[in-house]
Amino acid sequence: MQTDCRILEAAMKRFWLLLNTVRYLKLSQLFYQVFYRVRKRRSKIQSEPELRGALGPWPGAQFLQPASVDGKTFTFLGQTARLGDDWNHPSFPKLWLYNLHYQDDLNAKGSEDRRELSEYLIDSWIAANPPAEGNGWEPYCLSLRLVNWVKWFCRLESQHLKREWLISLSRQADSLERQLEFHIL
């Protein structure tokens, strides 16, 4: 009986929180919140993208500390955890998973000396995150990861760029283009 009351009380708190949040949204924001939750994300399958011109080194500074030294154990937001093959494991907080999907390690301090690890992270991400599935395919994660990948790719000779990486990069850019965040404007 007491458990039922607590469940009902928690549900009422969530309802009032939702109501209080929704009342400040514009109609367009509300529409796109519902639209993006109902609509299934898709990624258009494309042919292999072609490189146009030579890539040059990215001139930006590296200021972040690496979050991983082995590609298996990561520290984000003060929480260290060992990652298996599941980049979307529900036991990790969503913000922690977002940080994992950003792949900031590709451009962290000393990353130029960790090429094998960077390649492993990209290959592992592609293998564990099919197109349009999971946290990594949400717009904010996509936008940050795309920038990190491009910056990292710019440090490689074009013959070292794997075909799978370019296809994934193209799919991610396409997916981001299809998920404009009207619901937060």
Predicted regions and their residues:
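Extreme N-terminal leader/anchor segments
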Residues: 11-83
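Pocket-edge structural micro-motifs
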Residues: 78, 89-91, 107
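Repeat-mediated protein-protein interaction surfaces in helical alpha-solenoids
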Residues: 83-89
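Aromatic-lined, polymer-binding surfaces characteristic
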Residues: 94-185
